[in-house]
From Swiss-Prot:
Residues 67-73, 127-140, 195-207, 280-291, 352-360, 411-417 are extracellular. It is found in: Vacuole membrane. This is Vacuolar cation/proton exchanger 3. Residues 115-150, 309-344 are annotated as: Cation selection. Its main location: membrane. Ubiquitous. PANTHER family: VACUOLAR CALCIUM ION TRANSPORTER, VACUOLAR CATION_PROTON EXCHANGER 3. Keywords: Antiport, Calcium, Calcium transport, Ion transport, Membrane, Transmembrane, Transmembrane helix, Transport, Vacuole. Residues 1-45, 95-105, 162-173, 231-258, 313-330, 382-389 are cytoplasmic. One of its GO terms (biological process) is calcium ion transmembrane transport. GO terms for molecular function: calcium:proton antiporter activity. Belongs to the Ca(2+):cation antiporter (CaCA) (TC 2.A.19) family. Cation/proton exchanger (CAX) subfamily.
């Protein structure tokens, strides 16, 4: 039998060590908790308080309150639109921060997915409610807004600031994007022509089948384009001046992050959830807003709704043009248009297919013709690789003509209903 006094002595000898170990463990846990809290507070400060657009955030909760307390659909629509605008910008910011940690390939896929997340979320809620024309027109409006208004304002502002010289950009990149946009026009044109020439094999079904097949082809084409861009090719399709940029500046611009990877993921999840909530109220208020504001649904969908997703892109495109970084401006404006036409629209067709909704690529003749003419105008503007304020002014004036056209346009499907 062991001596109890020996056991007690051993316990007394090891007691201070056990106490020190427990104290050290609690200190480590406390320090980790403190670091977590400090990191969380820092990310909140950066994400919430560094963007002036966030002054519009209170309009989001206000729109929800108005939805349940009044029947003023016009105010609910406007407040929802204002509330989503800063969320769209912060969603893009969180995506860019996460892309820093993931590398160019995954970062490119993230940008393809979340770059136009606001438009996709609004489109999915509209699809859920069977508002196929709102989906088609809002996505068309985003393309037109980016190509004409965003790029026009950027060219105009950059041309005024740098009026003594021509601003140049990569012609090769512009040609590739123009080609993809023309392919998107082709994908939208054939279902419309098939419908209006009454040459379908199965009336009302052939255009849907063709749209679904074309959407899959367009998604493959966009995936190939992404791979082509992200495969590390050092050729004419890289942005101009990239080879001349000092390594220090490149590292400084490309690799520095303001928030951590897990913080970026958390913000992406929270912002996407909040955009989803507000999008539901926005979509539900569209028809009521059309009546109360005395505006056509087509005008709201094509002109007003794209403001939600394009406000941040508009500001950043102008800023980069004023800094004489035209390739980044084109990446924002034309790149976003390419992404919507070759990824978001086909993706919505596939999602509608899964939902049992007959979402197709028949955007009607008026909308398809508008897109076709716009792509041609922009392609001619970009063919020489030079930007100036006159080109910007012409693009802005073209957008005003488009806006006026949709203000007096009566949607044939709406009138039939």
């Amino acid at each position: 039998m062991e001596n109890p006094q020996i056991e007690m002595g051993a316990f007394k000898a090891n007691g201070p060590q056990l106490q020190n170990g427990g104290l050290r463990s609690s200190m480590v846990q406390s320090w980790n908790l403190q670091r977590f809290v400090e990191s969380a507070l820092r990310s909140i400060r950066i994400v919430i308080f560094t963007s002036k657009l966030n002054l519009l955030l209170p309009f989001g909760p206000a729109s929800i309150i108005l939805h349940y307390t009044t029947s003023r659909h016009g105010l609910v629509f406007l407040f929802s639109m204002l509330g989503i605008t800063p969320l769209a910008e912060r969603l893009g910011y969180a995506t860019e921060q996460l892309a820093i940690y993931t590398g160019p390939t995954v970062g490119g896929l993230l940008n393809a997915t979340f770059g136009n997340a606001t438009e996709m979320i609004i489109a999915i809620y509209a699809l859920k409610n069977g508002m196929i024309r709102v989906v088609q027109q809002s996505l068309l409006g985003s393309i037109l807004s980016n190509m004409l208004l965003v790029m026009g304002c950027a060219f105009f502002a950059g041309g005024i600031v740098h009026r003594n010289k021509d601003q140049v950009f990569s012609k090769a990149t512009a040609v590739v994007n123009s080609g993809l946009l023309l392919m998107a026009v082709m994908g939208l044109m054939f279902p419309a022509v098939l419908h209006f020439t009454h040459s379908e094999v199965r009336q009302g079904a052939s255009e849907v089948s063709l749209s679904r097949f074309s959407s899959c082809i367009m998604l493959v084409a966009y995936a190939s384009y992404l791979y082509f861009q992200l495969s590390g090719r050092n050729n004419a399709y890289s942005p101009i001046g990239s080879e001349e940029m000092p390594n220090e500046d490149a590292a400084e611009e490309d690799e520095e992050s303001e928030i951590g990877m897990w913080e970026s993921i958390a913000w992406l999840a929270m912002l996407t959830l909040w955009v989803s909530i507000l999008s539901e109220y926005l979509v539900n208020a569209i028809e009521g807003a059309s009546d109360s504001l005395n505006l056509p649904v087509a005008f709201i969908s094509v002109i007003l709704l794209p403001i939600v997703g394009n406000a941040a892109e508009h500001a950043s495109a102008i800023m980069f043009a004023m800094k004489d970084k035209l390739d980044i401006t084109l990446g924002v404006a034309i790149g976003s248009s390419t992404q919507i036409s070759m990824f978001v629209i086909p993706f919505c067709v596939v999602i509608g297919w899964m939902m049992g909704q007959k979402m197709d690529l028949n955007f009607q003749l008026f909308e398809t013709a508008t897109l076709f003419i716009t792509v041609l105008v922009v392609a001619f503007m970009l063919q020489d690789g030079v930007a100036n304020y006159l080109k910007g002014l012409m693009l802005i004036l073209c957008y005003l003509i488009v806006a006026a056209s949709f203000f007096v346009h009566v949607d044939p499907q709406s009138s039939d209903d």
